[in-house]
């Protein structure tokens, strides 16, 4: 039986990546909140990843 989470790095980046966040007003709000809070990673694009990305 197939479960819900079928990880794909491309889909993850396109949905939650920096460019996706910057594309909408709400996404820019998300980024500003995370900057204000002092998050180490603003988006999934900031993760330290291997060659697959």
From Swiss-Prot:
It comes from Leptospira interrogans serogroup Icterohaemorrhagiae serovar Lai (strain 56601). It holds the Pfam family Ribosomal_L34. PROSITE patterns: RIBOSOMAL_L34. This is Large ribosomal subunit protein bL34. Residues 44-53 have a biased composition (Basic and acidic residues). GO terms for biological process: translation. Residues 30-40 have a biased composition (Basic residues). InterPro entries: Ribosomal_bL34 (IPR000271), Ribosomal_bL34_CS (IPR020939). Keywords: Ribonucleoprotein, Ribosomal protein. One of its GO terms (molecular function) is structural constituent of ribosome. NCBIfam families: rpmH_bact (TIGR01030). One of its GO terms (cellular component) is ribosome. Belongs to the bacterial ribosomal protein bL34 family. Residues 23-53 are annotated as: Disordered. It comes from the Bacteria. Signal peptide: none annotated.
């Amino acid at each position: 039986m197939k479960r819900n989470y079928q990880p794909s790095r491309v889909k993850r980046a396109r949905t939650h990546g920096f460019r996706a966040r910057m594309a909408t007003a709400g996404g820019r709000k998300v980024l500003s909140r995370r900057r204000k809070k002092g998050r180490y990673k603003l988006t999934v694009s900031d993760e330290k990843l291997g060659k697959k990305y």
